[in-house]
């Protein structure tokens, strides 16, 4: 699994998320070309200059502010452009603002980058991924969202802390909407192949409070926004991780958001499920077995997203 030679990544939107993602990508050495695009050209230029000053400390990289035309031949387009989520505002409240931004930008990107992988990050990510697929007409492997990859990381971190183990040894998923209706999948959660209940018994750990864990995971972004105004570091690492598995053709299983049909009774809706991600993008969804309550909750999450899409006339 080798890195594509001369990989090019373009980031549309250089707010806190886009700029932090640029930093994470640059530090990782994933790309040889990194293009920053923003409606505020001065902001993009400033971010590019600031990052460029660190050129002596990373692998050779050409980072610069540009236009949509400069995205030509990009391997990945990372779309973070959108209004910020304000305190007390849900991700779904952003739909009207950010759908319009996407509609204005995507046709111009497609003109120069018809073969790129499009990673949608701006919120509400599931709705915007749905819109991007409809507008672009591109195949579903080529357009997908960051989904619940970060939520899954939060879930695993919570379980790891409780179990006092390395988070990388915890396997558990958050599925559905990246937002308030997301679903924690407890039935398949394990620590290095040992089901949680058995692991608790082996280690003499009392049963975990599922409600408290789910609440912390679901409300993490709201709490951070309340404390510091925005979330951007963890999502930056999320973006870097997704780009990494694409550029290195890793066949990693990530809970990215993409179109779902004929699974769990869900039709024509973008949400997150365990998915093989590689050089082709979102290659294959893995339909894991869920308990009845989990499947019902997942269907409910899908219905909430469909209702938003319908209300917005999308």
UniProtKB/Swiss-Prot annotation:
Swiss-Prot/TrEMBL GO biological process terms: glycolytic process; lactate metabolic process
InterPro entries: L-lactate/malate_DH, L-lactate_DH, L-lactate_DH_AS, Lactate/malate_DH_C, Lactate/malate_DH_N, Lactate_DH/Glyco_Ohase_4_C, NAD(P)-bd_dom_sf
SUPFAM superfamilies associated with the record: LDH C-terminal domain-like (SSF56327), NAD(P)-binding Rossmann-fold domains (SSF51735)
Subcellular location: Cytoplasm
EC number(s) stated in the UniProt entry for this protein: 1.1.1.27
GO annotation, cellular component aspect: cytoplasm
Enzymatic reactions: (S)-lactate + NAD(+) = pyruvate + NADH + H(+)
Activity regulation note: Allosterically activated by fructose 1,6-bisphosphate (FBP).
GO molecular-function term, one example from the UniProt record: L-lactate dehydrogenase activity
Organism superkingdom: Bacteria
Positions of substrate binding: 85, 91, 123-126, 151-154, 231
Protein residues bound to beta-D-fructose 1,6-bisphosphate: 156, 171
Keyword Manganese attached: no
Broad class of where this protein is predominantly found: cytoplasm
Residue positions of the active site: 178
Sites where the protein binds NAD(+): 17, 38, 43, 82-83, 121-123, 146
UniProt cross-references to Pfam families, sorted A to Z: Ldh_1_C (PF02866), Ldh_1_N (PF00056)
Pathway(s) per entry: Fermentation; pyruvate fermentation to lactate; (S)-lactate from pyruvate: step 1/1
Record keywords, A-Z: Allosteric enzyme, Cytoplasm, NAD, Oxidoreductase, Phosphoprotein
Modified residues (Phosphotyrosine): 222
Family, similarity comment: Belongs to the LDH/MDH superfamily. LDH family.
Function, in words: Catalyzes the conversion of lactate to pyruvate.
Subunit and interaction comment: Homotetramer.
Protein name: L-lactate dehydrogenase
Biological source species: Desulforamulus reducens (strain ATCC BAA-1160 / DSM 100696 / MI-1)
């Amino acid at each position: 699994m080798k890195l594509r030679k001369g990989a090019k990544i373009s980031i549309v939107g250089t707010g806190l998320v886009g700029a932090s993602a640029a930093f994470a990508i640059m530090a990782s050495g994933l790309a040889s070309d990194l293009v920053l695009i923003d409606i505020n050209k001065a902001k993009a230029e400033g971010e590019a200059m600031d990052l460029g000053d660190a050129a002596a400390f990373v692998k050779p990289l050409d980072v610069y502010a540009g236009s949509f035309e400069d995205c030509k031949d990009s391997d990945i387009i990372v779309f973070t452009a959108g209004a910020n989520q304000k305190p007390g505002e849900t991700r779904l409240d952003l739909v009207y603002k950010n759908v319009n931004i996407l509609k204005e930008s995507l046709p111009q990107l497609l003109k120069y980058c018809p073969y790129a992988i499009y990673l949608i990050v701006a919120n509400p990510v599931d709705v915007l991924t749905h819109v991007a697929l409809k507008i672009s007409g591109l195949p579903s492997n080529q357009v997908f969202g960051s989904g619940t990859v970060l939520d899954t990381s939060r879930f695993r971190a919570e379980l790891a802390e409780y179990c006092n183990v390395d988070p990388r040894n915890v396997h558990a998923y958050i599925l559905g909407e990246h937002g308030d209706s997301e679903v924690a999948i407890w039935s398949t959660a394990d620590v290095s192949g040992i089901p949680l209940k058995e692991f608790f018994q082996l280690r003499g750990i009392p049963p975990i409070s599922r409600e408290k864990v789910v609440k912390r995971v679901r409300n993490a972004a709201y709490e951070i926004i309340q404390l510091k105004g925005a979330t951007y570091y963890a999502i930056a690492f999320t973006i870097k991780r997704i780009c990494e598995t694409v550029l290195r053709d890793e066949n990693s299983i990530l809970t990215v958001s993409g179109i779902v049909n004929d699974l769990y009774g869900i039709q024509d809706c973008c949400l997150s499920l365990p998915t093989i991600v590689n050089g082709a993008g979102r290659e294959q969804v893995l339909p894991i077995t869920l308990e009845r309550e989990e499947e019902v909750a997942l269907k409910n999450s899908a219905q909430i997203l469909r209702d938003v899409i319908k209300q917005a006339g999308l």
